[in-house]
UniProtKB/Swiss-Prot annotation:
Pfam families: Ydc2-catalyt. PANTHER family: CRUCIFORM CUTTING ENDONUCLEASE 1, MITOCHONDRIAL-RELATED (PTHR28072:SF1). This is Cruciform cutting endonuclease 1, mitochondrial. It comes from Saccharomyces cerevisiae (strain ATCC 204508 / S288c). The keyword Transport does not apply.
Amino acid sequence: MSTAQKAKILQLIDSCCQNAKSTQLKSLSFVIGAVNGTTKEAKRTYIQEQCEFLEKLRQQKIREGRINILSMDAGVSNFAFSKMQLLNNDPLPKVLDWQKINLEEKFFQNLKKLSLNPAETSELVFNLTEYLFESMPIPDMFTIERQRTRTMSSRHILDPILKVNILEQILFSNLENKMKYTNKIPNTSKLRYMVCSSDPHRMTSYWCIPREETPTSSKKLKSNKHSKDSRIKLVKKILSTSILEGNSTSSTKLVEFIGVWNNRIRNALTKKKSFKLCDILEIQDNSGVRKDDDLADSFLHCLSWMEWLKNYESITELLNSKTLVKTQFGQVFEFCENKVQKLKFLQNTYNND
């Protein structure tokens, strides 16, 4: 597709937004993962920014016949990532890899704990960056969950939070600079990927029906725990649905597990009713604390970007149709509203099981 054609699609999306209602813009923002601005003008700006990013992913998928996304939840003792692939003619993405790593134990065999020493941090993140490129295919996009800068109940920045923020920043820089450096070397294969800081709030809002914010700290903490538990439960339901529905094209099936993943999940489902995600990954005790929220978040970040890209592709197809422009715009917002309702139905289905 030419530059002019790409620009035309983005221009059509902006034209679609110009006379839209605020509620319509909110639905569009939601289904493509854009920031929901407080004014109509802000909503339009954020929608355009997200569409420009998704258009790059769409073009890469058209060129290569598939798109690979690797999403990370940064942590020193509980670093988790999920890698998925979506082929041009497949309706659902496939899980290629899913891991949780204790970075200190994997890359610092002779060092007890990571300090705030720049040399140690640099070495650890360099080794991590190289590790992420060991398995093929190389991702077309890396996403890193944006980290908070302080705890909810304190104005002070604690050492663990500081470490994970430093890890996030250096990892982002290493991934960007690895591509820039490699592409300057003559006679070498060029790297083509994007690096994105992925907003945890947008991911959570997409998958978990938002709860009303409360003014008290204790209620906020309970709400936060509820959201975390809901995300873990949701991922478990996505896993079980994927296996139990087999080749079904049910609207509740969102992802494909093949090979070893299929066997591991099936084994977990037959052994006990309540299973941990760590059990599916066959994680041993030395791979950090056996908690599932890091694995769930990396999985949902990756699946979110796959969903947002698929939704964006559907919108571009509607805008590229031969119908009248006004009809196209109406179809876009109808698609967005239907998608929101389907997602709410999906969430209610999973929550009521």
